[in-house]
Swiss-Prot record:
EC code(s) of this entry: 2.1.1.-, 1.-.-.-
Region forming the signal peptide: none
Pfam families given in the database record: FAD_binding_3 (PF01494), Methyltransf_2 (PF00891), NAD_binding_8 (PF13450)
Keyword Transferase applies: yes
Organism from which the protein derives: Cercospora beticola (Sugarbeet leaf spot fungus)
The UniProt record lists the keyword NADP: no
Family: In the C-terminal section; belongs to the paxM FAD-dependent monooxygenase family.
Keywords linked to the UniProt accession: FAD, Flavoprotein, Methyltransferase, Monooxygenase, Multifunctional enzyme, NAD, Oxidoreductase, S-adenosyl-L-methionine, Transferase
Stated name of the protein: Dual O-methyltransferase/FAD-dependent monooxygenase CTB3
Binding site for S-adenosyl-L-methionine: 279
Annotated stretches, region: O-methyltransferase: 1-429
Source species taxonomy: Eukaryota, Fungi, Dikarya, Ascomycota, Pezizomycotina
Lineage: superkingdom: Eukaryota
Length: 871
């Protein structure tokens, strides 16, 4: 019951979040309506990647809600809908009904039946069944028109070709699977398949295809759609392997390459490569003719492609190739025949040559999205029904390679693709290593095959500073890991701009980062200037100013590094990009003490199992709420607006020059009577110029223009309690940023114009308003666990007034990494307890420092007296 409730809640949250993201995108689009367009268009066409990701996650969550809400007694009813919908779809396609449906406007059932020469009553019943499933529309009684779905088939002949192939060949074969099993049992014979029974033929699929021109044409139309479809598309072949690393003139053999679509796509992007496309004689003849007649293929591409007649079951005749490319080849054949194909290539491999296989890699059940897994299972069953073959899990691929004297050196599963890419070499040349772009799903598959918790990755919840630092430390130590971030991408929301690191964090970064990443980090930092200037907000005069002094002394703040947050996070992702999954929010986790594993369940319905879970998922940490359920987070009573103002000539002319040397503070203290009688507390502005050296810009031209980082902090009543509360209700982040920017102007409306320039010229899209939360300095201990812990803001959030939140998180990550390096990814519980105790001591010191700063800057009361933070 609890599992059901958790799954339902997670799916509902995913629907809400992604529906809002989708609506925000649709409302912001300024598509010009094409008045000459006739067929309805899909409003989701041409959306950006972020919107498409939200759409996919919405569809996934809706699918899960449907599964959860349907009662067992209704299952057969939904199957009935499925087969009747398919029946109606076939009727509409085979009787060419869409040819007679107008591209714009409606048509009566009577007129449509007359045009198509079909019985009117049948037409109406069949159309209305299709309408129930979104195919066609009936906007008024007895008037039918295209829907956005049916319009695709009227607009794109390749989809209609796929439809004809599905209803005439795929469906009959699928329906006869049980009969084939009853007749032949377990067999790999190509003429004893469900396809043979469904089509009533005696020969294997490809033999029948060659003998049947109509079927051959239908199959070609189907394959054209496959190559153009994004989930099956050739772009993944282009980007999924490092073709650029091959030497100039390198030879690629496209084994079983058919018409050469794969080679052509790669050749267009990589002009230094040559290609040999191999296939059977009749296929090669057709391919040569088609390429010669295709004016869309440039001569420079054609000149680097040759065709060769070849049967891949025979000896490989090209022995000087650098890469042998097999796309959708092995899945057509059972293991014994696939082994022959691979062995023939293995015998021809020159030293250093590779095999690139683009084919389906089946996930373990439940480790990828429902919709993705459905498509992969469809492919698996299709191979079984047509060829007595199968799609393979990673373990199956590994075993197949081993049988042919090969081994997998790299695995890449592109997002939104039904096929992965396997890079293969002769056995003994390499081993599957940490450089692979293995997705969490494939990691789960590997782990399941070995059964060893030690082989499972460390799971890191959150790609903030603590999470990425821990990831880099684990990479440096050779410990496998995966990072899961709830945001859809790294810049999904403003998170502040400037960070200052002191000596302890600087040392931890040196411990954590590989040498090349640390060197890049140092060079990408902003110029650090030590000092402070204080201004009167009302007349714009300097009150206090000191260069160095206390800030550079032993008792003051001594910043080792001044860091642009975005540049820093980018550096922290260097070399581990393939280990980070965005748009993955943990719903809950569960531990298995007997297996020493922990499984994270995500709100999109997927899950992944690891050896250890580190909660670095911030203030709203799901890991903390489970691991330390009674942990106290308090509301400091403050709100803070973070902002960024670029140092344009106009800004430099208006803002006080001496306010742009180092740290500047402006304190807006309440008037006397308000302070005495009402208890009005101050509002404080902290700002600092962020400038980059010429050397940094020469090395990293993508660094932002010089800017001023600022934070305006004060009691939330000064910002308007209602405004602070309502910010989280904005659908659009742009709306929230704009409102925060307006609020900064309202709070400082009586300030001197020279200082107000900071807010008037700010980048309004970069402003963000947050409520300031903290934990108390004396953090109570909790029961430790051997395979789960929390660190950073997940467990000890603190006010920004101390300037040490990020410092503390970095040192936490360094300390936890040392535990995992020393004890492995199944550390004893006492080792985790010692880490957590030291973390609490470290946090206490820094929370106290933040508390002191908060009292001065906005009149915060003692943290122990603050009320609970309401999320």
């Amino acid at each position: 019951m609890m599992q059901f409730q958790r799954d339902l809640e997670a799916s509902l949250e995913a629907v809400s979040a992604n529906a809002q993201e989708l609506l925000k995108s649709l409302k912001s689009r300024k598509d010009v309506q094409d008045l000459n367009a006739s067929l309805p268009k899909d409003p989701l066409d041409n959306c950006d990647a972020q919107t498409q990701a939200a759409r996919a996650q919405l569809a996934e969550a809706a699918t899960r809600i449907l599964r959860l809400s349907i009662r067992p007694q209704e299952y057969l009813e939904h199957l009935q809908n499925g087969y009747q919908h398919l029946t109606c779809f076939r009727w509409l396609v085979e009787l060419n009904i869409l040819d007679h449906l107008p591209h714009s406007g409606t048509i009566s059932y009577t007129d449509l039946a007359r045009k198509a020469s079909v019985p009117p009553m049948q037409l109406r019943s069949i159309c209305r069944m299709a309408i129930c499933n979104g195919f066609l529309e009936e906007p008024e009684a007895n008037q039918v028109r295209h829907s956005r779905i049916s319009a695709l088939f009227a607009r794109d002949e390749s989809y209609l070709g796929w439809a004809r192939w599905m209803v005439n060949y795929s469906v009959p074969a699928a329906y006869k699977l049980s009969d084939a099993t009853r007749s032949w049992g377990e067999t790999v014979a190509k003429d004893q398949t469900a396809f043979n029974l469904g089509m009533d033929v005696k020969v294997p699929f490809f033999d029948h295809l060659r003998q049947t021109p109509a079927m051959k044409d239908a199959f070609a139309a189907y394959m054209r759609n496959v190559t153009s479809n994004a989930t099956w598309g050739l772009q993944h072949a282009v980007t999924g392997f490092d073709w650029a690393s091959l030497p100039r003139g390198a030879k690629v053999v496209d084994v079983g390459g058919s018409l050469g679509h794969g080679s052509i796509a790669i050749a267009k992007e990589h002009t230094h490569l040559t290609f040999v496309i191999q296939d059977l004689p009749e296929t090669v003849a057709g391919a040569r003719k088609e390429m010669a007649q295709n004016d869309k293929i440039e001569a420079s591409v054609k000149s680097r492609i040759t065709f060769q007649e070849h049967d891949f079951f025979g000896p490989q005749t090209v022995k000087d190739a650098d890469v042998y490319f097999l796309r959708m080849i092995c899945h057509d054949w059972p293991d014994n025949e696939a082994k022959v194909i691979l062995s023939q290539i293995r015998a021809a491999l020159k030293p250093g040559a590779q095999i690139v296989i683009m084919d389906t890699i089946l996930p373990q059940p439940g480790t990828t999205s429902v919709l993705q897994e459905q498509q992969l299972r469809i492919r698996d069953l299709t191979m079984m029904e047509v060829f007595n073959a199968k799609e393979r899990e990673l373990e199956d691929w590994s075993s197949l390679m081993q049988s042919a004297g090969l081994e997998i050196s790299r695995v890449n599963q592109p997002l939104n693709s039904v096929m992965g890419l396997l890079t293969v070499r002769s056995a003994g040349q390499t081993a599957l290593s940490g450089t692979n772009t293995l997705t969490p799903e494939l990691v789960t598959a590997v782990s399941a095959s070995t059964g060893s918790a030690d082989s499972r990755p460390v799971l890191i919840a959150g790609a903030g500073i603590a999470g990425l630092c821990l990831a880099q430390a684990l990479k440096k130590a050779g410990i496998d890991f995966r990072v899961f971030e709830r945001d859809s991408h790294i810049d999904a929301r403003p998170q502040g701009y400037r960070l200052k690191f002191e000596a302890d964090a600087a040392q931890s970064l040196k411990n954590i980062l590989p040498d090349d990443v640390y060197e890049a980090f140092e060079l990408s930092n902003a110029v650090t200037a030590v000092g402070e200037t204080d201004f009167n907000p009302f007349n714009g005069n300097i009150i206090h100013s000191r260069t160095g002094g206390g800030l550079s002394g032993k008792k003051g703040l001594y910043a080792t590094f001044t860091v642009d947050r975005k540049a820093f996070r980018t550096q922290l992702m260097t070399g581990i990009e393939d280990k980070i999954s965005f748009g993955k929010e943990i719903a809950y986790y569960k531990t298995d003490d007997s297996a020493s594993t922990v499984t994270a369940e995500f709100k999109d319905g997927t899950h992944v199992t690891g050896s250890f879970l580190a909660g670095t998922d911030g203030l709203h940490s799901v890991v903390r709420k489970t691991c330390v359920p009674d942990h106290r987070i308090v509301d400091t009573g403050a709100a803070c607006i973070y902002g960024k103002t670029v140092m344009t000539p106009e800004f430099l002319a208006r803002f006080p020059e001496k306010g742009l040397r180092f740290m500047t503070v402006v304190s807006d203290i309440a008037p006397m009577l308000q302070s005495c009688l009402i208890g009005d507390s101050p509002v404080t502005l902290l700002l600092e110029p962020i400038r980059f050296s010429e050397a940094s810009r020469a090395r990293y031209p993508e660094l932002p223009a010089d800017y001023v980082y600022w934070a305006l902090i004060g009691p939330k009543e000064r910002f308007g309690s209602q405004e602070v509360t309502s910010m989280k209700n904005f659908v659009s982040l742009d709306q929230a940023a704009e409102q925060a920017a307006k609020l900064s102007l309202a709070v400082t409306e009586e300030w001197h114009p020279s200082l107000r320039a900071l807010f008037e010229l700010q980048d309004t899209k970069q402003a963000s308003l947050i409520r300031v939360a903290s934990t108390i300095p004396d953090i109570p201990s909790w029961e430790s666990h051997s395979n789960v812990t929390v660190l950073g803001d997940s467990i000890h959030p603190m006010s920004p007034c101390g300037g040490v939140g990020a410092n503390t998180a970095i040192v936490d990550a360094d300390a936890l990494a040392k535990v995992l390096v020393e004890h492995g990814t199944k550390p004893p519980v006492n080792a985790i307890a010692e880490f957590e105790a030291a973390m609490r001591t470290r946090a206490k010191r820094n929370i106290w420092r933040s508390e002191v700063g908060s009292k001065r800057m906005f009149g915060q009361k003692n943290l122990v007296d603050c009320s609970e933070f309401v999320f």
